[in-house]
Structure formats: C-alpha cells, structure tokens
C-alpha cells in the first residue's frame, strides 16, 4: 500500500492550518569544484533516482479527508521541473549561502508534483559549489531522508543501497486494511492485547507529555511564525565530542543537547529574559526505525519532551542534568507513549484521525519552545560526480509556534548543527551557531583538566 500513515499526513495538516509554514526537510552539501554543467548533472541524477520510485510519485488527496493521501505515479513527471540552478555573487561566502538556504527552505513544495527539489548553487569561493536537497516531511523522516540523499552519491552506485528503498507501507495480508476493514478475529485479539499493554506502560509518559504541552513555557521563542527564515550552522569535530563522552560517561546526544542549552541560555540573557526551569521545553524526536527499515521512505519516530536546563550556569552541571533528564524521559515512557499513540491512530478510520489531528494543529501551542533532532549520517566521506562532499549541513523546519529548530547530523569526522529560525524573532541565527561551537569547546577544555572520581558503582559526575 502507498497510503500515508497518520504521522506522515500530520505534516501536511501542519501546513494546511498555517500558511506561513513549509514542512520540508533539507540537506546542504558543499562540494569541491568545479560544478558540472546542467545536462551532465541531470543525466547523472536521473540514473541515481531511477531505482527509487518515490521521486516520480505525487500525492493524490481524497476530498474532505475521506481517505488517506496516496502516492501515485506522476504521468507528467519532468526531472527538469525539480532541479534548479542558481548562483551567488562571486566569490560567495558562507553568510550569503546560508541566507539563500533560508529563503529556499521557506518556499513550499508544489503538492501537484512529486514533493522534492534539488538546487544546484554555484559561485562559492574557491570554486566550490553546493547542492540543497528538499524533501517534504510527509515523504520521509530524517533517517530515511539521509539514506535517500546518500543514495545520490557516487558510493551508492557500487552497491544496492538505492534498490532497497521500499514504499511507505508494506502490503498487509491479514489484520486490518484501511478502507476494507477486514479483520482476522484471533489476530485482532492479540493486537488489542498488545496495544492495551502498551497503553499501560506508556501512561506515565502520556501524563508527562500532556503536562509539558499544556503548561505555557516562560519564553519569547514560541508564538506565531512569519513567512521569512534565517539559517546558520555550526560544525564541531566528532573526536572532541567523543572525548567528552568518554570522560563523563555520557552520549553524543547528551553533549550536543548540552551545547544547544548553553547557546539558548546566552540568547535568553541577551534578550533580557531570565532563564528558568521551563524556558526551553524541547521536542526531541526519537527514531523507532529498525535496521531492516532503514531504507523505507516514511516517518518512524516517537518523541521526548525534556526541559533543557538553561537555568543552570555551570557547563558541567548542565551536561549532568541533560543526561539525567533524557535518561528519565526514556525510562518514564514518553517514547513508548508516542509509539502507542501512532499504533492506535493507524488502526482508526482515517477521517477520524485527520479531524483530530487538524483540531490539535489549530490549538495555540505555548508549552514547547524548540525542536532538536539528531540524525546519524554517513561516517565515510562522500563524492558526487567525482567531487568530494566537504560539508553536509542539515535543515529542519519550524511549525506549530516553534520559532526555532536545531538539526544535528554526523558526517565523516564532524558533527553539524543546522539552525532554522523565524526571521522576525531571532535577529542572528549565527549567534546560536557560534554559541554551540563555544559550548562544545568549553566542555572539551573541562574534560582535559577535570579528574573524574568514582563512587562505588557509579561515576560521581553522573546523576
């Protein structure tokens, strides 16, 4: 089946209720020169896209949401309508490139065509060029999109990566079929029992998420969104992050979120706002994608909703608290609640879930301030048409009153942070990016001079 799931379709609803929202996710690859000509690039791209049918499909919507949107082959598909070329004034610098990315990501994709675009950007200094790839979020989550984008590289031509990409939903031979409602009684009973057990396990997580969403955050960084964006990015060596991880027995995600926390803290202070416990309640997507589903084009995520400790002044204490809160959020059932909710929603008639999602999207959300998503990327350097990919920056959208978003992506030997912000609210997205780099450097310096003492059975620096 090629229908969208409830989660996939929710990204369309988020656009429907707010004309200023564009829910495309992106990846910006900066590549060594020279840039290929348009004909050669189109020919190479066509060859690499051929194994993945999704790039040639558009959505067929049902009137009044009477059925789930469905992927269908576009009879008028023209690659030239999806690949655009633009040039910066030579020699284009990083600020000019990021300004262009902000403008391009603010533009909505045309729902009458396959929901993706590729922009070839020329004019960068040192003969470099760039590729911005945009995919609508209803088409793929961050991990699926990263695998799709890696499939466009030269490395994918020598293996079966692209050919393993499947459609959004596999054929369902038993159980429930959307529209037909054919049910096997014994399987339905088993499924119902499993769902109920999941609901019980996720009850605590549900209460935590509900409390987070319904409690207004003490922050000016959530509210209505304009139609203009700012973009900036940070880059830190993975070796530095891993050194902090080893020293303090934390994860890469802990270090990244602690750095983001410090940067937001500085922004609050400069805006004259006192950082409080609930000033940075953050939506942290959690992948539920199994290894066997890495190449499937859909969304498979749950969520956590921790308060990042912007009220804490000490960098090391911030790292400890981030680690502790993420550990508690995972153990407390927040991620399980998201899984259970999606499992239930996908078993209900689509008109019912579409109505409910649309209603929720229209409610003024003031509890969550930002989103921070971390996607593992290629650990080997990539090449495109024989040219090295020097940098790979992620771009995640903003929506639902979240005026900033931070996407993290590991590539080769570095960890990249992409910051997208509402133009009217954040005057300098570069300040957030620089703050992240400074925060990581500070943690690295602390790790080099700090001795970690062990209590019986645990590190003294970890709560």
Swiss-Prot record:
GO terms for molecular function: diacylglycerol O-acyltransferase activity. Its EC number is 2.3.1.20. Pfam families: WS_DGAT_C, WS_DGAT_cat. Coiled coil: none annotated. GO terms for cellular component: plasma membrane. Signal peptide: none annotated. It is an enzyme of class 2 (transferase). One of its GO terms (biological process) is response to hypoxia. InterPro entries: Acyl_transf_WS/DGAT (IPR014292), O-acyltransferase_WSD1-like (IPR045034), O-acyltransferase_WSD1_C (IPR009721), O-acyltransferase_WSD1_N (IPR004255). It comes from the Bacteria. Keywords: Acyltransferase, Glycerol metabolism, Lipid biosynthesis, Lipid metabolism, Transferase. The active site is at 137 (proton acceptor). Disulfide bonds: none annotated. It catalyses: an acyl-CoA + a 1,2-diacyl-sn-glycerol = a triacyl-sn-glycerol + CoA. Induction: A member of the dormancy regulon. Induced in response to reduced oxygen tension (hypoxia) and low levels of nitric oxide (NO). Pathway: Glycerolipid metabolism; triacylglycerol biosynthesis. SUPFAM superfamilies: CoA-dependent acyltransferases. Belongs to the long-chain O-acyltransferase family. Catalyzes the terminal and only committed step in triacylglycerol synthesis by using diacylglycerol and fatty acyl CoA as substrates. Required for storage lipid synthesis. PANTHER family: O-ACYLTRANSFERASE (WSD1-LIKE) FAMILY PROTEIN, WAX ESTER SYNTHASE_DIACYLGLYCEROL ACYLTRANSFERASE 4-RELATED. This is Probable diacyglycerol O-acyltransferase tgs1. It comes from Mycobacterium tuberculosis (strain CDC 1551 / Oshkosh). The gene is tgs1.
